[in-house]
């Protein structure tokens, strides 16, 4: 086998790869591009994780940045906790829009009775965060890829918001599912499928972790385990709690949230004086109301269906699978469903950062440039909420600029991910049989 990378003469020290060209597709593009960790990569990860998470906790304790009130979501969780204690899912609550498995996360602070609800929730979120970090680092024990660093350094770009939402726990299920699916054993495939199925019962999107499983035995094992785990969890919750499917009643009337791509289009139209709508607080979020909002919502649903159809077409046409294909497909799928959604909450970036980090644990991934686009998108999401959220709601020049840039990056990342997934698996040469 020939080596395209020239080796230094014996007795000389190799210099780091030059970055005069684009580093995105280079096999030598590693974590050193972001952070130099010296001889102790695991200690470096632990140190950076500790420092950044302490900073996030301090921000949450003060909770005065921008409009403040990020922690209010946990207070809502605590209210729902009281409903679960009475043996029912929140009845008739328009803000409860989550699958029944989310109830387990909401109830989980009860296992730490010596702490307040908020303290216990934050502690469990940090534990889930640490588990994701450890799993990413362990995914390649020979060297720390920049996947670990994307997660450790990317999550704090969202400031303290990840500690006040249950999306870190959901992302942990998806990350662990994908890492299990990369193993070769039946038990690992079944574990990955079960974790994805449980994740789908918590927040739906982790089911997309299975979209890229290789055809044949792996798909049968993983998808069967996912269905069994999801149905078992659903049946168990329905047995012990009433109104477990009540969340379905709260989904149909959702409008266009101001942070979605459709919301940005309406904001630009309003700023240009060609749309007479307004912003209203509905279903626990700020949405646009006015002419054409319903039509735009239907268009978003149509685009979601088209995105799903594209994923099915990709799966049928794909003929080249690498170790990274299931990871790349999961990130692409979640990006597609994010940008076509009527709702893009800031915590969606937690999902995308986690999936990007998993992709970058594999040398064969084609998602490196996509992951890099997500980092500034995460930082802009923090500007949108909570730092400049009053400007976003009011539709000022500052608010519009932030949303156009953030959603532009998300759209670019989605199109780039779809193109690179397609070209690497459909238009590339067929994979040779071993």
Where are these regions (language model features)?
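Multi-pass membrane glycosyltransferase architecture that uses lipid-linked
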Residues: 2-11, 19-249, 298-434
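Short hydrophobic/aromatic helix or loop-helix immediately within or flanking a transmembrane segment
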Residues: 79-82, 92-116, 256-291
């Amino acid at each position: 086998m020939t080596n395209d990378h020239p080796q230094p003469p014996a007795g000389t020290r190799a210099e780091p790869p030059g970055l005069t060209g684009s580093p995105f597709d280079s096999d030598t593009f590693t974590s050193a591009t972001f952070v130099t960790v010296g001889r102790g990569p695991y200690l470096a990860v632990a140190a950076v994780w500790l420092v950044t998470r302490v900073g996030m906790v301090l921000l949450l304790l003060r909770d005065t940045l921008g409009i403040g009130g990020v922690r209010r979501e946990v207070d809502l969780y605590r209210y729902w906790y009281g409903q679960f204690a009475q043996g029912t899912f929140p009845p008739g609550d328009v803000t409860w829009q989550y699958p029944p498995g989310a109830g387990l996360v909401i109830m989980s602070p009860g296992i730490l009775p010596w702490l307040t609800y908020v303290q216990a929730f934050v502690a469990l979120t940090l534990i889930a965060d640490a588990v994701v970090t450890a799993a990413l680092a362990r995914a390649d024990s020979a060297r720390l890829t920049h996947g670990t660093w994307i997660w450790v350094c990317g999550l704090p770009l969202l400031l303290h918001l990840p500690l006040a939402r249950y999306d870190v726990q959901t992302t942990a299920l998806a990350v662990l599912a994908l890492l299990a699916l990369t193993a070769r054993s039946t038990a690992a495939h079944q574990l990955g499928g079960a974790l994805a199925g449980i994740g789908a019962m918590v927040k739906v999107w982790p089911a997309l972790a299975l979209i890229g499983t290789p055809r044949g035995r792996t798909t049968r094992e993983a998808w069967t385990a996912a269905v069994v785990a999801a149905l078992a969890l659903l049946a168990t919750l329905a047995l012990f709690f009433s109104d477990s499917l009540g969340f379905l009643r709260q989904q149909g009337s959702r409008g266009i949230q101001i942070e979605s791509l459709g919301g940005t289009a309406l904001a630009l139209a309003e700023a240009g004086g060609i749309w007479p709508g307004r912003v209203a607080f509905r279903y626990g979020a700020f949405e646009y109301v006015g002419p054409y909002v319903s039509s735009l919502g239907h268009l978003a649903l149509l685009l979601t269906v088209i995105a799903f159809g594209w994923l099915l077409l990709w799966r049928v046409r794909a003929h080249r699978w690498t170790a990274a294909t299931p990871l790349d497909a999961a990130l692409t799928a979640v990006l597609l469903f994010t940008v076509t959604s009527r709702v893009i909450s800031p915590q969606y970036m937690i999902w995308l950062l986690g999936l990007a980090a998993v992709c970058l644990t594999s040398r064969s991934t084609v998602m490196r440039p996509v992951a890099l686009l997500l980092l500034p998108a995460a930082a802009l999401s923090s500007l949108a909420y909570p730092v400049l959220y009053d400007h976003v709601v009011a539709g000022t020049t500052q608010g519009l600029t932030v949303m156009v840039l953030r959603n532009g990056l998300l759209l670019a990342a989605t199109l780039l991910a779809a193109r690179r997934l397609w070209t690497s698996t459909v238009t590339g040469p067929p994979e040779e049989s071993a």
